[in-house]
């Protein structure tokens, strides 16, 4: 047990002035969602922690007492990949990645109060996850997902024959998606059953592929799809899953459907909201998500957008009757927020939904028959909601959330009542010592068209009588936001504790402030958003005395990387001592090399060949813009970023070098659009923070700050400088 002490929360402590370092950030325990048992007494959650000395990330599972917040270790077995309550007291079903079947997984059953006394119910012949269970007579029906072969079998990579050639051949899109070249395998939902024999359950290894019979369907949909893309009715007889429209080009359109299919696969799945279908509300052709059955299984709620090629359109709640041809109903359709998840109360009368609102992921309730103009009510909680589950059959929910000041917030929330705190990581984990909400505040500034929100994040031990350089962080998306939530990549508090005050703006294009602000960035990437940033910088410069803009820096990733590249060629670029561009576009016409064409075709009002002028309008490589470049810039771009090719970063660095602008190129050949591997993340922080600290003067004012020399990776430097006079 001593070796597993990190699995349990340590004793609470008082706040101190110690800085939050990248090592603290990366090695802090990471906790998954807490899922309560059927009675609402215990919850189980996954936890892992990276160890820099051993270069590993051991993991395990904990139990959370829902009465007093106490945490205990359930298991330290890292091979246990998921645990689900069996629906029978404290019994659980879990998946073990080590199995007698090569490449397969084991299905085990145990009791949370005596986890070591487990037995194996059976094996699954391949990688399998996302279990959902429901009693059906004397059986327990389940669904989960894995990769499917073209024939419909569960794909087992370990058993697959080695290809004689590395060639890839394509007749349609996608060729590659986010970080992977698309192959013949695809995600599919499979169904099976646990059969009771005496006091034990067994699984015969037989699975039914519910997706493959629908040609070109896929569920969960990559790269972000998971168990939220499907659901199992309470009687275990019907399955709902989301798939992109099989008959439409997936790279060009976002249209997706909710399919219904018998658990036993006796009929082929059929969509309930097919485009222009008899049940589908007129004009609704966008992406569907979050299907969930009502407690009695007679209705299904889901979310859907209207526009067929816009991934950031507003989601609206829809409810369909199962086994009926009645039209689908839209619920609270005029609410100017975009729900992200929906669940039914135990009596089926109330819907609980999460939605981003003013840079915070909030929980709301509304009647299941709410009219179009109904405004959902907020349920009080701290931070942003990641997931929520009902506590027994009550109206209370167990929220797993986080914030800018804590990476895990477990709390119970009840409509009309104050929230009840169970466990907040910043009050327990030594790595998060000193973090709290007092160092964070909102800022509202008149932007190009409307008031624009930003977060101000102050360093540990902040003194209002001192002056701190500005760290101006620009978010990606562009339809995204800096929310009151924890980031495991770009974390404002890590930047602040180098000695900066962070200003993290949510300019035009941001989500959570009404759909108009989100939509207004369309075909205007370098227009209103840039003007918003200028106005925010000017407000900070003129009004906030403790922020030193003369020694400020700016950094951003994805769209934020584009904006940094755009700023380099604008007047605002001369206001910063250093810039950091991570995976940002450089040449306007290169956008055609992306994967999801619907994204660029929406944001630039047409295809690459029909609306070329729109792609070129916000081209950071224009000669008249490049002529202004002079601010030192770090460029980060990774080989497995298929959103925009690594050539974008190399090209940007080429020009910076030939221009004689102090610059550096950071590349990870094994990373994607993001840097996620712990050791790579540490190097990323050493290089990025070391770069800005060098030019902002932080290295001189804060001797403990990160320096470029802290990074052990040898720098490639074959010549004094690339600049020469033609």
From Swiss-Prot:
EC code(s) of this entry: 3.4.14.-
GO BP terms, alphabetized: proteolysis
Alphabetized Gene3D superfamilies for the sequence: alpha/beta hydrolase (3.40.50.1820), TolB, C-terminal domain (2.120.10.30)
Region (Disordered): 269-291
A cellular component annotation (GO) from this entry: extracellular region
A single GO molecular function term of this UniProt record: aminopeptidase activity
Keywords: Aminopeptidase, Glycoprotein, Hydrolase, Protease, Secreted, Serine protease, Signal, Virulence
Coarse class of the protein's main subcellular location: secreted
Compartments where located: Secreted
Signal sequence segment: 1-19
The keyword Glycoprotein belongs to this UniProt entry's keyword annotation: yes
Broadest EC class assigned to this enzyme: hydrolase
Keyword NAD appears in the UniProt entry: no
Domain of life of the organism encoding this protein: Eukaryota
SUPFAM superfamilies: alpha/beta-Hydrolases, DPP6 N-terminal domain-like
Glycan attachment sites: 96, 252, 605, 699
Catalytic residues (UniProt): 558 (charge relay system), 641 (charge relay system), 673 (charge relay system)
Function per UniProt: Extracellular dipeptidyl-peptidase which removes N-terminal dipeptides sequentially from polypeptides having unsubstituted N-termini. Contributes to pathogenicity.
PANTHER family: DIPEPTIDYL-PEPTIDASE 5-RELATED, SERINE PEPTIDASE S9 FAMILY MEMBER
Family per similarity comment: Belongs to the peptidase S9C family.
Protein known as: Probable dipeptidyl-peptidase 5
Name of the gene this protein is made from: DPP5
């Amino acid at each position: 047990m001593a070796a597993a002490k990190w699995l349990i929360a340590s004793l609470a402590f008082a706040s101190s002035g110690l800085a939050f370092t990248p090592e603290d950030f990366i090695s802090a325990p990471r906790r998954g969602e807490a899922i309560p048992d059927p009675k609402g007494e215990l919850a189980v959650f996954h936890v892992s922690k990276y160890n820099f000395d051993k270069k590993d990330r051991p993991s395990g599972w904990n139990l959370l007492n829902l009465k007093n917040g106490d945490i205990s270790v359930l298991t330290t077995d890292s091979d246990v990949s998921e645990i689900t309550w069996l629906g029978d007291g404290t019994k659980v079903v879990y998946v073990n990645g080590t199995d007698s079947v090569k490449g397969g997984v084991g299905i085990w059953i145990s009791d949370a109060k005596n986890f070591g006394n487990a037995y194996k119910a059976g094996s699954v012949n391949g990688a399998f996850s996302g279990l959902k269970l429901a009693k059906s007579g004397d059986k327990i029906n389940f669904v989960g997902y894995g990769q499917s072969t073209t024939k419909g079998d569960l794909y087992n990579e370990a058993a697959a024959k080695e290809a004689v050639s590395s060639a890839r051949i394509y007749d349609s899109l996608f060729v590659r998606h986010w970080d992977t070249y698309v192959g013949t395998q695809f995600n599919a939902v499979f169904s099976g059953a646990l059969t009771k024999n005496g006091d034990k359950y067994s699984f015969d290894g037989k699975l039914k592929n519910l997706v493959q019979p629908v040609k070109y369907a896929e569920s969960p949909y990559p790269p972000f799809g998971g168990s939220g893309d499907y659901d199992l009715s309470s009687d275990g007889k019907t399955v709902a899953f989301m798939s992109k429209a099989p008959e439409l080009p997936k790279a060009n359109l976002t249209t997706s459907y909710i399919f219904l299919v018998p658990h036993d696969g006796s009929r082929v799945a059929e969509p309930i909201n097919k485009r222009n279908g008899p049940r589908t509300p007129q004009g609704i052709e966008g992406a569907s998500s979050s299907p969930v059955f009502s407690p009695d299984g007679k209705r299904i709620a889901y979310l859907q957008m209207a526009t067929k090629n816009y991934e950031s359109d507003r989601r609206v709640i829809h409810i369909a009757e199962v086994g009926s041809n009645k039209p689908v109903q839209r619920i609270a359709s005029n609410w100017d927020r975009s729900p992200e998840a929906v669940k039914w109360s135990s009596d089926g009368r109330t819907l609980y939904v999460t939605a981003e609102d003013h840079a915070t992921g909030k929980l709301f309730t509304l009647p299941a028959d709410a009219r179009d103009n109904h405004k959902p009510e907020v349920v009080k909680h701290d931070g942003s909601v990641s997931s929520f589950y009902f506590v027994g059959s009550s109206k209370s929910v167990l929220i797993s959330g986080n914030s800018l000041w804590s990476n895990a917030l477990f709390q119970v929330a009840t409509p009309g009542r104050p929230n009840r705190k169970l466990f907040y990581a910043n009050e327990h984990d030594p790595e998060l010592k000193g973090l709290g909400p007092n160092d964070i505040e909102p800022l509202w500034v008149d932007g190009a068209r409307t008031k624009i929100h930003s977060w101000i994040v102050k360093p540990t031990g902040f003194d209002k009588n001192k002056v701190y350089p500005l760290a101006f962080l620009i978010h990606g998306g562009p339809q995204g936001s800096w929310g009151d939530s924890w980031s495991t990549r770009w974390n404002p508090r890590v930047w602040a504790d180098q000695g900066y005050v962070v200003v993290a703006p949510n300019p035009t294009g941001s989500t959570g402030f009404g759909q108009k602000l989100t939509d207004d960035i369309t075909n205007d990437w370098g227009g209103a958003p840039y003007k918003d940033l200028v106005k925010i910088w000017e407000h900070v410069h003129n009004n906030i005395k403790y922020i030193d803009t003369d020694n400020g820096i700016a950094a951003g990733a994805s769209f934020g990387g584009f904006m940094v590249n755009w700023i380099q060629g604008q007047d605002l670029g001369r206001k910063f001592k250093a810039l950091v561009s991570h995976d940002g576009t450089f040449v306007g016409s290169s956008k055609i090399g992306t994967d999801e064409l619907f994204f660029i075709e929406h944001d630039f009002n047409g295809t690459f060949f029909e609306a070329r002028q729109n792609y070129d309008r916000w081209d950071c490589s224009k000669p008249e813009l490049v002529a202004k470049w002079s601010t030192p810039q770090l460029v980060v771009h990774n080989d497995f970023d298929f959103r925009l090719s690594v050539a974008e970063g190399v090209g940007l660095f080429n020009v910076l070098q030939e221009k004689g602008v102090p610059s550096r190129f950071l590349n990870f050949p094994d990373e994607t659009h993001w840097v996620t591997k712990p050791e790579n993340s540490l190097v990323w922080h050493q290089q990025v923070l070391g770069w800005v600290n060098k030019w902002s003067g932080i290295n001189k004012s804060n001797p403990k700050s990160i320096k470029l020399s802290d990074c052990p990776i040898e720098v490639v430097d074959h010549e004094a400088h690339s600049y020469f006079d033609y």
